[in-house]
């Protein structure tokens, strides 16, 4: 029994020593959890790893030596009130000037080379300043809403505010490796707020996507209406044209018999004996001078019509003659010769009557 108790005491003492050395060796830490693979969990795991790296670096700072110049440099960074002062550039600095300033300061304040108190926070501030100012959109927002506050605190407390809503999604070490590891990106570094705002960012993005989808659906539903609006001017013009034709007064005569319009009574002009047709009310409306003027108009219209018909007859006769000669077709030649130019004969008669009159 004594031997068993001694073994239990030794086991208990070993367990206590393990807890002191490692803290929670068998169970997981209270604030840890298995990442589920979602964006927020992966982000939290990444930042926890980054915080552990900063803690190890800060522990090394207390045991290393530093120069007075390095300490003054850290103090200068802490006193800066905006990102331009941190990098030591003007507000209209170009991308090349920003890169040059960052490279110089990053090498100077990297924790491996600068062990002054606060060098880690200064290095992080330098990286965050460059990451913001190198992005055109973030820089524009920073110039408009910046100059609020710059607070250097312990990363573990998660209250470092290198300008609210202007924290980089890339760590200072990753940014440093980008520059000095031979993999400088061709584009700008994209920025987001801290991890606590990621859910808000994705909610805003999904809300924006839903809004765009709803807008597209509205556009689809409005497509027939939009098409109708576009065709409306054409419809108005056609409608006006039809109404105008319907409301326009019918001419008092016709060169041809048209029972549907009432032109069933045959007449002839007094001068050239041109036939035309009128309705039953014609005699009441036209007498004397008005009738003579109207008949002049009728004769002119009739001559124009006969001239057009004569030209068509000559054109047809000429085409048949040419085809007969081209194909040496006797049948076409005979048809061309037998074709009578009746309207041309009428035209000649009318011209003779006009000359005689």
Curated annotation (Swiss-Prot):
<dbReference type="Pfam" id="PF09320">
    <property type="entry name" value="DUF1977"/>
</dbReference>
<keyword id="KW-1133">Transmembrane helix</keyword>
<protein>
    <recommendedName>
        <fullName>DnaJ homolog subfamily C member 18</fullName>
    </recommendedName>
</protein>
<keyword id="KW-0472">Membrane</keyword>
<dbReference type="InterPro" id="IPR051100">
    <property type="entry name" value="DnaJ_subfamily_B/C"/>
</dbReference>
<dbReference type="InterPro" id="IPR036869">
    <property type="entry name" value="J_dom_sf"/>
</dbReference>
<dbReference type="GO" id="GO:0005789">
    <property type="term" value="C:endoplasmic reticulum membrane"/>
</dbReference>
<dbReference type="InterPro" id="IPR018253">
    <property type="entry name" value="DnaJ_domain_CS"/>
</dbReference>
<dbReference type="Pfam" id="PF00226">
    <property type="entry name" value="DnaJ"/>
</dbReference>
<feature type="transmembrane region" description="Helical">
    <location>
        <begin position="227"/>
        <end position="247"/>
    </location>
</feature>
<feature type="domain" description="J">
    <location>
        <begin position="82"/>
        <end position="146"/>
    </location>
</feature>
<keyword id="KW-0143">Chaperone</keyword>
<dbReference type="InterPro" id="IPR015399">
    <property type="entry name" value="DUF1977_DnaJ-like"/>
</dbReference>
<dbReference type="InterPro" id="IPR001623">
    <property type="entry name" value="DnaJ_domain"/>
</dbReference>
<keyword id="KW-0812">Transmembrane</keyword>
<keyword id="KW-0256">Endoplasmic reticulum</keyword>
